[in-house]
Amino acid sequence: MLSGLLLLAGCGNPVQRKLEGRWLGESVENFDAKEVAAATGWARGLSLEFAGSRLTVAVPAEEPRTGKYKVASVRENDVQLAVTRADGAVDTTNLKLDDERSIRFMIGDTRAVVLRREQ
């Protein structure tokens, strides 16, 4: 049993493998009509890059930030990540895995930024 657990630990989390790569913001969902244009502009400047256990987040008008992340929980296609910042603080973020080419970065319970895998 222990050897099986060690083998699984060495393989990495299956969700982590699905996230691997660079994701680019494309659009937004469930924003008020008056916010859609600005939110879409911001979303198109957003990128998430997953490399091993590292996550780099780039947002418009800010320097990219990199931290170590782990998959905190998975429920169907809902994934919660725990991301450790350079100062040691831990942030959580929620994603919805739509398919191998599309994820949604959740903002609250209903709003989302849709990201597509970089080709």
PLM feature spans:
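Solvent-exposed strand-loop boundary residues in beta-sheet-rich modules
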Residues: 29, 54, 61, 75, ...
